[in-house]
Amino acid sequence: MPTTLIFTSFFLALLGLSLQRKHLLSLLLTLESMALALYVSTALWALNNTSLPIMAAPLIILTFSACEAGMGLSLMIATARTHNTDQLKALNLLKC
């Protein structure tokens, strides 16, 4: 039961990621919800297995999730300062 709920939340976040293309902040929030679902599934998987290297996997995923959030917010601030908006339509990476 918990695994189906975790996979459902992951795929709903993936669906939201593919459908929500207006603001950069909403895109970052859906990425964070995907990372949270991945962290919870890895933590449950580590509880079932007793191997020592597997126990460190949730902490590694949590570390990468925090780095991803920090990089995403810094990119959002940089683009908001240069383009004066956080909408994804206004961003043209070929001009930068």
Curated annotation (Swiss-Prot):
The keyword Translocase applies. It comes from the Eukaryota. GO terms for biological process: ATP synthesis coupled electron transport. Its main location: mitochondrion. It is an enzyme of class 7 (translocase). InterPro entries: NADH_UbQ_OxRdtase_chain4L/K, NUOK/Mnh_C1-like. It holds the Pfam family Oxidored_q2. Gene3D superfamilies: 1.10.287.3510. It is found in: Mitochondrion membrane. Its EC number is 7.1.1.2. One of its GO terms (molecular function) is NADH dehydrogenase (ubiquinone) activity. It is a multi-pass membrane protein. The chain crosses the membrane at residues 1-21, 27-47, 57-77. One of its GO terms (cellular component) is respiratory chain complex I. Core subunit of the mitochondrial membrane respiratory chain NADH dehydrogenase (Complex I) which catalyzes electron transfer from NADH through the respiratory chain, using ubiquinone as an electron acceptor. Part of the enzyme membrane arm which is embedded in the lipid bilayer and involved in proton translocation. This is NADH-ubiquinone oxidoreductase chain 4L.
